């Protein structure tokens, strides 16, 4: 089996199972007759670009980092002037008096990975489920500036 076929198998396993460790991936591969070293598996996972996310119970699992549509409505980008991130929190800067409007838009979008928002006059704090999600949202919002 070549590298490309092996990486396709890894992607298939990740999509089909809720897997949290490289050891679990390695065991799934072995069940399918594919033997890999830890170094090869680590390299494959890095090349595939897997994300490690948390589920509702707080357990880590691997997820494909396939591009997904933006979770934000187009109106959200209209109000954002600047995006900063501190760990799992985003700070969105707006014009004076627009932060509460932006908070309402984000809250109405009901994005599962956003736990809540707190608005000031021109600054909005967005609390994300974890740091990886905050990074993804930061990148998404910054791309629209």
From Swiss-Prot:
Which SUPFAM superfamilies does the entry link to? C-terminal domain of arginine repressor, Winged helix' DNA-binding domain
Alphabetical GO biological process terms: L-arginine biosynthetic process; protein complex oligomerization; regulation of arginine biosynthetic process
- Keywords linked to the UniProt accession: Amino-acid biosynthesis, Arginine biosynthesis, Cytoplasm, DNA-binding, Repressor, Transcription, Transcription regulation
Record GO terms (molecular function): arginine binding; DNA binding; DNA-binding transcription factor activity
Is Lipid metabolism set as a keyword in this record? no
Example GO CC term: the record gives: cytoplasm
- Which pathway? Amino-acid biosynthesis; L-arginine biosynthesis [regulation]
The record's listing under Pfam families reads: Arg_repressor (PF01316), Arg_repressor_C (PF02863)
Question: Which coarse location class describes where this protein primarily resides?
Answer: cytoplasm
Localisation per UniProt entry: Cytoplasm
As for family, the record states:
Belongs to the ArgR family.
Q: What function does this protein fulfil?
A: Regulates arginine biosynthesis genes.
* Protein name in UniProt: Arginine repressor
- The source organism is Streptococcus pyogenes serotype M1
């Amino acid at each position: 089996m070549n590298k490309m076929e092996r990486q396709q198998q890894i992607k298939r396993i990740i999509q089909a199972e809720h897997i949290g460790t490289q050891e679990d991936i390695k065991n799934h591969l072995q069940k399918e007759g594919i033997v890999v070293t830890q170094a090869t598996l680590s390299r494959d996972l890095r090349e595939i670009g897997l994300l490690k996310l948390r589920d509702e119970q707080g357990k880590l699992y691997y997820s494909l980092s396939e591009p997904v549509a933006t979770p934000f409505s187009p109106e959200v980008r209209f109000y954002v002037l600047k995006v900063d991130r501190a760990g799992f929190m985003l700070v969105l800067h707006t014009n004076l008096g627009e932060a509460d409007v932006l908070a309402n838009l984000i809250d109405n979008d009901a994005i599962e990975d956003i736990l809540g928002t707190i608005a000031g006059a021109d600054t909005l704090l967005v609390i994300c489920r974890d740091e990886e999600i905050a990074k993804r949202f930061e990148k998404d919002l910054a791309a629209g500036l």
